[in-house]
């Protein structure tokens, strides 16, 4: 009882110093946690990727679409279990500040390929039968207060116009790594609109998602798919889903390196603050420590007291 009481009394010998030291350490730890969370969030999509899925896109750039007819040829490649496709939509909900990902998908094949998107059978069926239907992640629905049956208006950017979707389902993630901030709707709805306004852009998609029979065949299947469309008007680049996600991370690699560097600097700051506090405490109490040693207290006890008070 004597030692804790002694430590407590000496802690408040300099109340302001103790308060500022504690506050500095709390801020530093909170900053480190926030910075590491940002870095982890950047890699979340890649970490949640499946080894059994490939992504096929234009070899020139992701902004160039691929003909939908490629789907049938990809299905015929040995080792391919199924094929789906998706388009980035890029709509605006009310204002530019309300950003969230939106994808036009082939619902039957896409949902079958992503079992980690957990949705009830009733909501899945309602989504499949409603051409203007959409599903969103739980976090996104909670953020905007949406519930099943609501109407979601989006202002198109890549695909101009006002788009209205009926919320038919809210999906959860099979685990915490699954993104729950995305909206999915019918690719056919988007394609029909494009064919009316820009006929030459119809029946094209941004990416194909390829499900493998055996993940070990990823490299072989990727090479075969790209060889199939070599020397065509729209050559392809096929890579694992994780590699595809990491390609987006690579675009902002300099920012990530800077954030990681700052997070480690924060650790150094924490250690410097603690070392400075310990040094100040020890210097101020040399006489007291000498007296305690003269009274018979050992060096280990005095050292422990310094650490506890710091």
Which residues does each PLM region occupy?
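Start (N-cap) of specific transmembrane helices in multi-pass transporter permeases
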Residues: 6, 10, 24, 280-288, ...
